[in-house]
C-alpha cells in the first residue's frame, strides 16, 4: 500500500507540474507586445464578446448543474454529488482559462507575426499549449486527488462501490459541461460564420474579416468559444471519462486480487507520465529552415509520442510490472501485453492524425477534388463535398477496428481500455494543436481589421491555413478517442450489470432479474440498436437546424445594417458589432438546451420504456445496452463524416485565396464564380465540422455515462 501511496502522490505531482507550466506560459504570453492602439481596440471587442457569451453560457449550465447535484446527493450519496461537482467545475474552469488566454494571445500573435513568422508561430502555439496542459493537468488532478481523498482520507477500499460511483459521477459532471459547451459554442461560432459569409462575401463581395462586415467581431468571438473553450471541455471530458472507465474496469476485473491497487493506479500513472512528455514535446515546436509550419507542429507531436513510449514503460515499472497480473475471462493478463496495448493506442493516434490531415489538408486529393468541382458550380461543389465526407469515414474506422481487435487479443477489454488511456495521455499536446487554430484565425482577423501591411496578413494566413488543418486533425483524434472511450464505458456497463446481477442478495433490485442477453436474436436488442442509432442523426439534425436559424438571424441583421447605414460600405459609418454578438449569444443559449438534453435523457427513456412494455428488467437492460452500441457506432461515423468533410470544404475554399489552377490549366482567383461556389460549400461544411460533428462526441459518451449512473441508482434502491 505504501508503494501505491507513493505512486498516487507522484501522479498528483505530475498534474500540479502541468498546471504550473501552464501558469508560466500564461505569464510569458501576456508579457508580449500588444501592437497598435487600433489592434488593441479590436482585440478588446473580441474579449468582451467572448467573456459575455461564456459567462451567460455557464450561468445557464449552472442551473442544470445544481439540479443534477441535488439529485446525485439524494439518489446516490454526498460523495457522488461532490464527484459531479468536481468534474463540472474543473471542466468549466479549463474552458474559461483557455479562452481567457486565447482572446489575449490573438492580438499579440498578430503583432509577433508582423515581425517574423517564427515569432507568430511560437506565441500562438504557446497559447494553445496553455489550454492543452490545463486540460490534461486539471483532468488528471480531478480524478487522482478525488481518488486519494476517497481511498486514503475517507478510508474506502479501491474497488468499493462508493469510490466507483463517485468517480463515474465526476465523469458525468465533465460530460454535462462538455455537451453544452461544445454545442452552444458551435452554434454561436457557425451562426456568425455562415451569416457573415453569405452576406459579406457572396452578396456584398467584401473579403473575410473585413471591418465593414457587422458580423466580423462575432465571427472572431465564435472561434474562441467554439474551438478553444468547446474543444477544451470536450477533451477534458474524454480524458476524465476514459481514465475513470478504465479504473472501473480494473476494479471489476481484478476484484479481490492482490494486484487491484496497482491496476487501479496504472491508468493514472500512464496519464501522469504522458503529461510530462507533453510538456517536453512543446519545446520541440520550432520553425525549421524549410519554413514548414505544419512540420514544426508535427515535430512536437512526434517527440511527445516517442517520449510517451518511455513514459508507458515507467508507468509499467512503477505499478503493474511486466509479468502476469491475473486472469480475466480465461485470458492471462501480463504487464508486457498491457504495455504493447498502450503502444497500439499511440499508433492509432498517429494513424488517425495522418488520415485526417490527408482528407482535410490543402494540396491533397480530397480537397483538390472539391475545389475542382467548384469550377462547374455550386451544386457540384456540394455533391463532391458530401462524397469526400462519406469516404473519409472508411480508413479511420479500419484503424479503430484494428486497434480494438489487436488489444483485445493481447489483454481483453482491459487492454483496449489501456490503449484508449494511452491515446488520451497525450491530449495535452493534441489540444495545444487545436487551440493554436482560433488564435491564428483571430490574429488574421485583427491584422485585416487594423489595416496592417499585406505581408502581415500573408504571415497570419499561412498560420491560419495550418490552424484549420490542426483543428480538423484534433477533431479526428477527439472522435476516435471518444468512440473507443465509449466502447470502454459500454464494457464497464455490461460488466457492472453482470456484477450486480451476480450479487442480488446485496442489491435487491437485481435479485429476481435473470440473465441479460445481448444476443441479436433478442428483438429488444435489435430495437435498442435502432433506437441508439437514431440519436446521433437526430442530435446532428437539431444542431444543424440551430445553426441555420442562428445564421439566418445574422443574415437579417447584417442586411439591416447595410440597408440602414449605407455609409458602412464606404467606411464613413461604423457597424454595430455588439448587436450581432448579443443576438448570437441569446440564440446559442436558447438553441443548445433541448439538443443537449437528448443524449442525457435517452438512456432513461429506453430503460423505463422497455421495462413498461415488456415487464422484464433483463429485456430493459438488454435494450439499453444495445442502444449504447447503436449510439457509439453511428455516432462515430456521423462525427467523422461531418468533421472531415467540413474541413475539406473549408480548405477547398481557401485554395482559391491564392488562386486555384483547375484540370484545364485555368487559374481561378478570389471573387471568381468558382470561388463563390466554394464559399457555398463552406457554408454547409462549417456547421458540419464545427457544430454538429464535434458535438456528437460528448453525446456518445454522455449516453454511456448516464447508463452507468442509472445502474448505480438502481443498485442503491432497497
UniProtKB/Swiss-Prot annotation:
The record marks 182, 227, 234, 690, 701 as: Important for ion transport. It is an enzyme of class 7 (translocase). GO terms for molecular function: diphosphate hydrolysis-driven proton transmembrane transporter activity; inorganic diphosphate phosphatase activity; magnesium ion binding. Mg(2+) 1 binds at residues 193, 197. This is K(+)-insensitive pyrophosphate-energized proton pump. Homodimer. It comes from the Bacteria. Its EC number is 7.1.3.1. Ca(2+) binds at residues 650, 682, 686. Mg(2+) 2 binds at residues 220, 223, 441. Keywords: Calcium, Cell inner membrane, Cell membrane, Hydrogen ion transport, Ion transport, Magnesium, Membrane, Metal-binding, Translocase, Transmembrane, Transmembrane helix, Transport. The record marks 471 as: Determinant of potassium independence. Belongs to the H(+)-translocating pyrophosphatase (TC 3.A.10) family. K(+)-insensitive subfamily. Proton pump that utilizes the energy of pyrophosphate hydrolysis as the driving force for proton movement across the membrane. Generates a proton motive force. Substrate binds at residues 190, 689. It holds the Pfam family H_PPase. It is found in: Cell inner membrane. InterPro entries: PPase-energised_H-pump. It is a multi-pass membrane protein. The chain crosses the membrane at residues 6-26, 61-81, 83-103, 112-132, 133-153, 168-188, 235-255, 265-285, 300-320, 335-355, 385-405, 413-433, 472-492, 524-544, 593-613, 620-640, 695-715. Its main location: membrane. GO terms for cellular component: plasma membrane.
Amino acid at each position: 500500500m505504501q508503494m501505491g501511496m507513493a505512486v498516487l502522490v507522484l501522479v498528483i505531482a505530475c498534474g500540479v507540474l502541468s498546471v504550473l507550466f501552464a501558469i508560466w506560459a500564461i505569464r510569458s504570453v501576456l508579457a508580449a507586445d500588444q501592437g497598435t492602439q487600433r489592434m488593441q481596440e479590436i482585440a478588446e471587442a473580441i474579449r468582451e464578446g467572448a467573456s459575455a457569451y461564456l459567462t451567460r453560457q455557464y450561468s445557464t449550465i449552472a442551473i442544470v448543474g445544481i439540479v443534477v447535484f441535488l439529485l446525485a446527493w439524494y439518489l446516490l450519496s454526498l460523495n457522488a454529488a461532490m464527484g459531479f461537482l468536481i468534474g463540472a467545475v474543473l471542466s468549466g474552469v479549463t474552458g474559461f482559462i483557455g479562452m481567457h488566454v486565447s482572446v489575449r494571445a490573438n492580438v499579440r500573435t498578430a503583432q509577433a507575426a508582423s515581425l517574423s513568422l517564427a515569432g507568430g508561430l511560437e506565441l500562438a502555439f504557446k497559447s494553445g499549449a496553455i489550454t492543452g496542459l490545463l486540460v490534461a493537468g486539471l483532468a488528471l488532478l480531478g480524478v487522482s486527488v478525488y481518488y486519494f481523498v476517497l481511498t486514503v482520507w475517507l478510508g474506502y477500499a479501491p474497488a468499493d462501490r462508493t469510490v466507483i460511483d463517485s468517480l463515474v459521477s465526476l465523469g458525468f459532471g465533465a460530460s454535462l459541461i462538455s455537451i453544452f459547451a461544445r454545442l452552444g459554442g458551435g452554434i454561436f461560432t457557425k451562426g456568425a460564420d455562415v451569416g457573415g459569409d453569405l452576406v459579406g462575401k457572396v452578396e456584398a463581395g467584401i473579403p473575410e474579416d473585413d471591418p465593414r462586415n457587422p458580423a466580423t467581431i462575432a465571427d472572431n468571438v465564435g472561434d474562441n468559444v467554439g474551438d478553444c473553450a468547446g474543444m477544451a471541455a470536450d477533451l477534458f471530458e474524454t480524458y476524465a471519462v476514459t481514465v475513470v472507465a478504465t479504473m472501473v474496469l480494473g476494479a471489476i476485473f481484478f476484484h479481490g486480487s492482490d494486484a487491484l491497487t496497482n491496476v487501479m493506479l496504472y491508468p493514472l500513472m500512464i496519464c501522469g507520465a504522458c503529461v510530462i512528455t507533453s510538456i517536453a514535446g512543446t519545446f520541440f515546436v520550432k520553425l525549421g529552415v524549410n519554413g514548414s509550419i505544419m512540420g514544426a507542429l508535427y515535430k512536437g507531436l512526434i517527440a511527445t509520442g516517442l517520449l510517451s513510449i518511455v513514459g508507458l514503460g515507467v508507468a509499467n515499472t512503477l505499478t503493474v510490472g511486466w509479468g502476469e497480473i491475473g486472469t480475466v475471462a480465461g485470458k492471462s493478463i501480463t504487464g508486457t501485453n498491457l504495455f504493447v496495448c498502450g503502444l497500439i493506442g499511440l499508433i492509432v493516434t498517429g494513424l488517425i492524425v495522418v488520415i485526417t490531415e490527408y482528407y482535410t489538408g490543402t494540396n491533397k486529393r480530397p480537397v483538390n477534388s472539391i475545389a475542382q468541382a467548384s469550377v462547374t458550380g455550386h451544386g457540384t461543389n456540394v455533391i463532391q463535398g458530401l462524397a469526400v465526407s462519406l469516404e473519409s469515414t472508411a480508413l479511420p474506422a479500419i484503424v479503430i477496428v484494428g486497434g480494438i481487435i489487436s488489444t483485445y487479443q493481447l489483454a481483453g477489454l482491459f487492454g483496449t481500455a489501456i490503449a484508449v488511456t494511452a491515446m488520451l495521455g497525450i491530449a495535452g499536446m493534441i489540444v495545444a494543436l487545436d487551440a493554436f487554430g482560433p488564435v491564428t484565425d483571430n490574429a488574421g482577423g485583427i491584422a485585416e481589421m487594423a489595416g496592417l501591411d499585406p505581408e502581415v496578413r500573408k504571415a497570419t494566413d499561412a498560420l491560419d491555413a495550418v490552424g484549420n488543418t490542426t483543428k480538423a486533425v484534433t477533431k479526428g483524434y477527439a472522435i476516435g478517442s471518444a468512440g473507443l472511450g465509449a466502447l470502454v464505458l459500454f464494457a464497464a456497463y455490461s460488466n457492472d450489470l453482470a456484477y450486480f446481477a451476480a450479487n442480488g442478495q446485496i442489491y435487491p433490485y437485481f435479485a429476481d432479474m435473470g440473465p441479460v442477453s445481448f444476443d441479436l436474436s433478442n428483438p429488444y436488442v435489435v430495437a435498442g440498436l435502432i433506437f441508439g442509432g437514431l440519436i446521433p442523426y437526430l442530435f446532428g439534425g437539431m444542431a444543424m437546424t440551430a445553426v441555420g436559424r442562428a445564421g439566418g438571424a445574422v443574415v437579417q441583421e447584417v442586411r439591416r445594417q447595410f440597408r440602414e447605414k449605407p455609409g458602412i460600405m464606404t467606411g464613413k459609418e461604423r457597424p454595430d458589432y455588439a448587436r450581432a454578438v448579443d443576438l448570437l449569444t441569446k440564440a446559442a443559449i436558447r438553441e443548445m438546451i433541448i439538443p443537449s438534453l437528448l443524449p442525457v435523457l435517452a438512456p432513461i427513456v429506453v430503460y423505463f420504456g422497455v421495462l413498461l412494455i415488456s415487464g422484464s428488467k433483463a429485456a430493459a437492460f438488454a435494450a439499453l445496452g444495445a442502444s449504447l452500441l447503436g449510439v457509439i457506432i453511428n455516432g462515430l461515423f456521423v462525427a467523422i463524416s461531418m468533421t472531415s468533410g467540413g474541413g475539406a470544404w473549408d480548405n477547398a475554399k481557401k485554395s482559391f485565396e491564392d488562386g486555384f489552377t483547375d484540370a484545364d490549366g485555368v487559374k481561378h482567383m478570389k471573387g471568381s464564380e468558382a470561388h463563390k461556389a466554394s464559399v457555398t460549400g463552406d457554408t454547409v461544411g462549417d456547421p458540419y465540422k464545427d457544430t454538429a460533428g464535434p458535438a456528437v462526441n460528448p453525446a456518445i459518451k454522455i449516453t454511456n455515462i448516464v447508463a452507468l449512473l442509472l445502474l448505480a441508482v438502481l443498485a442503491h434502491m432497497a
